[in-house]
């Protein structure tokens, strides 16, 4: 199978400051990839290089087997087949929604029967058929998002690129537009690259996630693999919350840390030092011990919240704060037991 997108060893600097460093990625036909990372990590620059708005210093980019950038090739933007929705606004404010989508078809402008059929199909696909005669100033932000996607899909691009497409919308509208946009992309069989800083969004909607930090890709994997089998401590901390401790491995599949001796998931040899990570949801709090890994603790303070109970407790010399969706009624100062569900993760050499 020919990759919908292939990026090989791509690098880019601005004024001798590296922004992208040896980026390699591939995307299968119909696959949705989320690129996530903190602000300034290089994810938007990577998207601009893919779209042809920035020229990489080195590396190569190919689209469905066709090289569009390499040492000897640099196709103009007009000769590539990317769709890049200008999210949040229509590109031509004096044209109706219908004409804005027709604008995406290029020279045809929706004059032929085939072009009109394509425009009507995109209106229906994105749920805006009833808005066809309206003008941009008559649309809400969410409606303009749908128009932007319909216009980008109209010329049938091989790949859709989206840079923080939902960031300007309120939470309720963002959720609805996001689900509709993902559904439209999948219904149209399009590959897509989303740039996002929202890890929950990526975990829910991506086929694969690429985590970036300081111009490098730390790991590319499915959401499940990235969450359960992370290859890098920085990646796992960005993709989800974690409680970390310095630790040393033992020969029996455990590690010693400030919470005591805990089971770990690691293939490193005994004696290796590194960082142990526990997901907060692995903990549960009970009044008594049970035949599982138990850590004795003292409850310092419990604070009921809307959807969980915030509990501060001391385990040995360590003070932990956990947000537990359900917890027994415990008085401050009472002794309790933390149960650990499953092994902790261990990252050799990542000392705190």
Swiss-Prot record:
SUPFAM superfamilies: P-loop containing nucleoside triphosphate hydrolases (SSF52540). It is a peripheral membrane protein. Keywords: ATP-binding, Cell inner membrane, Cell membrane, Ion transport, Iron, Iron transport, Membrane, Nucleotide-binding, Translocase, Transport. It is found in: Cell inner membrane. It catalyses: Fe(3+)(out) + ATP + H2O = Fe(3+)(in) + ADP + phosphate + H(+). Residues 5-239 form the ABC transporter domain. ATP binds at residues 37-44. InterPro entries: AAA+_ATPase (IPR003593), ABC_SmlMolc_Importer (IPR050093), ABC_transporter-like_ATP-bd (IPR003439), ABC_transporter-like_CS (IPR017871), ABC_transpr_FbpC (IPR015853), FbpC_C (IPR041230), FbpC_RD (IPR055223), P-loop_NTPase (IPR027417). The keyword ATP-binding applies. Its EC number is 7.2.2.7. SMART domains: AAA. The keyword Heme does not apply. One of its GO terms (molecular function) is ATP hydrolysis activity. GO terms for cellular component: plasma membrane. Belongs to the ABC transporter superfamily. Fe(3+) ion importer (TC 3.A.1.10) family. Part of the ABC transporter complex FbpABC involved in Fe(3+) ions import. Responsible for energy coupling to the transport system. The complex is composed of two ATP-binding proteins (FbpC), two transmembrane proteins (FbpB) and a solute-binding protein (FbpA). This is Fe(3+) ions import ATP-binding protein FbpC. It comes from Neisseria gonorrhoeae.
């Amino acid at each position: 199978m020919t990759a919908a997108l292939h990026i090989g060893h791509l690098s880019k600097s601005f004024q001798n400051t590296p922004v992208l460093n040896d980026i390699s990625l591939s995307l299968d036909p119909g696959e949705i990839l989320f690129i996530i990372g903190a602000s300034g990590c290089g994810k938007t620059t990577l998207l601009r290089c893919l779209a042809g708005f920035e020229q990489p210093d080195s590396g190569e980019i190919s689209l469905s087997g066709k090289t569009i950038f390499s040492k000897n090739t640099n196709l103009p933007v007009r000769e590539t087949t990317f769709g890049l929705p200008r999210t949040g606004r229509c590109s031509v404010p004096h044209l109706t929604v219908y004409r804005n989508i027709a604008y995406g078809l290029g020279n045809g402008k929706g004059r032929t029967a085939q072009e009109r059929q394509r425009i009507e199909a995109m209106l229906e696909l994105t749920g805006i058929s009833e808005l066809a005669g309206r003008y941009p100033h008559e649309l809400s932000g969410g409606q303009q998002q749908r128009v932007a996607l319909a216009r980008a899909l109209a010329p049938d691009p091989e790949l859709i690129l989206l840079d923080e497409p939902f960031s300007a919308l309120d939470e309720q509208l963002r959720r609805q537009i996001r689900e509709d946009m993902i559904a439209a992309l999948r219904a149209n069989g399009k590959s897509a690259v989303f740039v996002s800083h929202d890890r929950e969004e990526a975990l829910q909607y991506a086929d694969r996630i690429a985590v970036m930090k300081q111009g490098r890709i730390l790991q590319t994997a499915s959401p499940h693999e990235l969450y359960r089998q992370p290859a890098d401590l920085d990646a796992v901390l960005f993709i989800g919350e974690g409680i970390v401790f310095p630790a040393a491995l033992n020969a029996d599949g455990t590690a010693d840390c400030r919470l005591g001796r805990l089971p770990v998931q690691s293939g490193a040899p005994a004696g290796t030092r590194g960082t142990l990570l526990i997901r907060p949801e692995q903990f549960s709090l009970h009044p008594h011990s049970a035949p599982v890994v138990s850590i004795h603790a003292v409850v310092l303070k419990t604070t009921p919240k809307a959807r969980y109970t915030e509990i501060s407790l001391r385990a040995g010399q360590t003070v932990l704060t956990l947000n537990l969706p359900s917890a027994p009624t415990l008085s401050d100062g009472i002794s309790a037991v933390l149960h650990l569900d499953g092994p902790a993760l261990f990252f050799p050499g990542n000392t705190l």
